[in-house]
């Protein structure tokens, strides 16, 4: 049974984290403005993430200031790249782990339908519970392997797909591109060696019918932006 059909795990509900001084200015520098209610919900998410991290490995970053910078700000750098998505558009976050960047995006863009794909059952159960605790009715969770979902019922089902800290681009591109429709966006959050990985993975782009658009700097690295340019290649028996 998928985790989003189960009763959510009971989660501790600690006091929300408050953003560090100057955080609104940091957001403005990347072209993002959020109201106080959204900021508060992001702080609520971070508090729950750190509380549950004491029971399961969700993040190696545990400093209350660093999580705003390296998790929230890093994730929200994707927001300006998603402006073309209208209300009701579908976004998949592959290998979501503790919910990054999918949950901050779902909090900031409640008009999007966000699917978090996480194969580890414990982490998927956390995602279900935290989405329920935050009242995120626009979030669903699939506790299955992305390799299978991208070939199955979620193939071509999304307008955009994101992934963060999942693997090198030569592996990540074939994993993520199948989820989006033709002309759909693929946004991959990488470290400082993104260009090196792009060169390594250049041959994969043509095979996956994907085109490189640009890279965008984040507080911790770069976002690689791709756009799917065609339908999925047909697979023939025996190949």
From Swiss-Prot:
GO CC annotations, alphabetized: cytosol
Localisation per UniProt entry: Cytoplasm
Coiled coil regions, renumbered to chain: none
Main location: cytoplasm
Enzyme Commission identifier(s): 2.1.1.170
Reactions listed under catalytic activity: guanosine(527) in 16S rRNA + S-adenosyl-L-methionine = N(7)-methylguanosine(527) in 16S rRNA + S-adenosyl-L-homocysteine
Gene3D superfamilies: Vaccinia Virus protein VP39 (3.40.50.150)
Gene Ontology terms, MF aspect: rRNA (guanine-N7-)-methyltransferase activity
Keywords: Cytoplasm, Methyltransferase, rRNA processing, S-adenosyl-L-methionine, Transferase
Annotated positions binding S-adenosyl-L-methionine: 95, 100, 118-120, 146-147, 164
Source organism superkingdom: Bacteria
One Pfam family here: GidB
Annotated InterPro entries: rRNA_ssu_MeTfrase_G, SAM-dependent_MTases_sf
The family this protein is said to belong to: Belongs to the methyltransferase superfamily. RNA methyltransferase RsmG family.
NCBIfam families tied to this protein: rsmG_gidB
Function: Specifically methylates the N7 position of guanine in position 527 of 16S rRNA.
Protein's UniProt name: Ribosomal RNA small subunit methyltransferase G
Gene that this sequence comes from: rsmG
């Amino acid at each position: 049974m998928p985790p989003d059909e189960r009763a959510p795990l009971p989660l501790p509900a600690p006091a929300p984290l408050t953003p560090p001084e100057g955080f609104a200015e940091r957001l403005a520098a990347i072209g993002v403005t959020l109201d106080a209610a959204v900021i508060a919900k992001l702080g609520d998410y971070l508090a729950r993430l750190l509380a549950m991290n004491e029971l399961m490995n969700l993040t190696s970053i545990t400093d209350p200031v660093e999580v705003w910078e390296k998790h929230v700000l890093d994730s929200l750098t994707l927001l300006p790249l998603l402006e073309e998505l209208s209300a009701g558009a579908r976004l998949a976050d592959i290998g979501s782990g503790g919910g990054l960047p999918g949950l901050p995006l779902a909090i900031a863009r409640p008009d999007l339908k966000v699917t978090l794909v996480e194969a580890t059952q414990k982490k998927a159960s956390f995602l279900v519970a935290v989405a329920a605790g935050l009242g995120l009715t626009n979030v669903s969770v699939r506790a299955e392997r992305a390799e299978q979902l991208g070939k199955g019922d979620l193939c071509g089902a999304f307008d955009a797909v994101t992934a963060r800290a999942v693997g090198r681009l030569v592996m990540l591109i074939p994993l993520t591109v199948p989820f989006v429709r033709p002309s759909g966006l693929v946004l991959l959050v990488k470290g400082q060696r993104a260009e090196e990985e792009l060169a390594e993975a250049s041959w994969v782009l043509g095979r996956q019918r994907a085109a490189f658009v640009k890279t965008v700097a984040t507080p911790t690295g770069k976002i690689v932006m791709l756009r799917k340019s065609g339908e999925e290649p047909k697979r023939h028996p025996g190949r």
